[in-house]
Amino acid sequence: MPKMKTNSGSKKRFTLTGTGKIKRKHAFHSHILTKKSKKRKRNLCYSTTVDTTNVSQVKELLAMK
């Protein structure tokens, strides 16, 4: 059976940390920023980890299963 291909869109969006968690960026921080508050924009600029409910799906896209 051939190897599973990595989803090319996913490999641009997700990175694996040293502890095995999957890191992602927040959405809604690219345009139409004038109506968003300073606090909201600041919180959106930081990266976060993928939720535990979605980890298996993201790992499948990254061909890690």
From Swiss-Prot:
Pfam families to which the protein is assigned, alphabetical: Ribosomal_L35p
Gene Ontology annotations of biological process type: translation
SUPFAM superfamilies per UniProt: L35p-like
Region (Disordered) location: 1-20
Gene Ontology MF: a single term: structural constituent of ribosome
Keywords of the record: Ribonucleoprotein, Ribosomal protein
Assigned GO CC terms: cytosolic large ribosomal subunit
Similarity annotation: Belongs to the bacterial ribosomal protein bL35 family.
HAMAP family, per the entry: Ribosomal_bL35 (MF_00514)
Protein's recorded name: Large ribosomal subunit protein bL35
Source species of the chain: Bacteroides thetaiotaomicron (strain ATCC 29148 / DSM 2079 / JCM 5827 / CCUG 10774 / NCTC 10582 / VPI-5482 / E50)
